[in-house]
Amino acid sequence: MIKRTSKTYIDNLLQNNITWNILDIGCGYNANKFAKVICDVQDLSNHYQDKKFIRLTEKKLPFKDKEFDFVVASHVMEHVEDIDFFIEELERVSKKGYIELPTKLEDNLVFENKKDHLWHMDFDDVENKLVVSKKVQYFEPVLTVSTTKKLNEVFRTSLVLELIWEDSINHIVNKSTEDTFKKISVLNLLKKYFSKRLRMFFK
């Protein structure tokens, strides 16, 4: 089961379940404050001296089956080459979790995303399914990460996809760009993804 959620809901959930064994994977320097175990491909052990830190050196996560009550994967999945295997590993090591991803709009707007991200992410609200496709750069980016973070304060639902899952992560991966590549204007992406607060300016 996977469905939409919010960061606020997740923070409250974890705060109310402080006995949970929580893993944060691929968080860089911004681990969830409730995580007990941190893992990343970088050696960040000095930064997380008050946590258990494990450096990742292989695709397979170094944890037992269902070792964790909850796993956080925030802005990680879009970087992973073998995304099917990564999702299987999340399901294997934890009972449930939170996934945070950039929307297709944010992915195209941000300079750093152009070379670092491999996948576009959407969510099918009818079938409750994560829809993954090869990234296509529809237009040249115009924003920095720092600028986008400021926009997130107002337009978070338009720029960030927030999902909670339990038992399994229903998803589909389309690795071909042939069916997905269409010239999409900045205006059309804004209309599709931006919240109603901003849409009035683009009618």
Model-derived segments and their meaning:
Residues 1-18, 185, 191-202:
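Long, low-complexity intrinsically disordered regions enriched in Ser/Thr, Asp/Glu, Pro/Gly
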Residues 7-109:
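Conserved SAM-binding loop
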Residues 84-203:
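S-adenosyl-L-methionine-dependent methyltransferase catalytic module, highlighting the catalytic core
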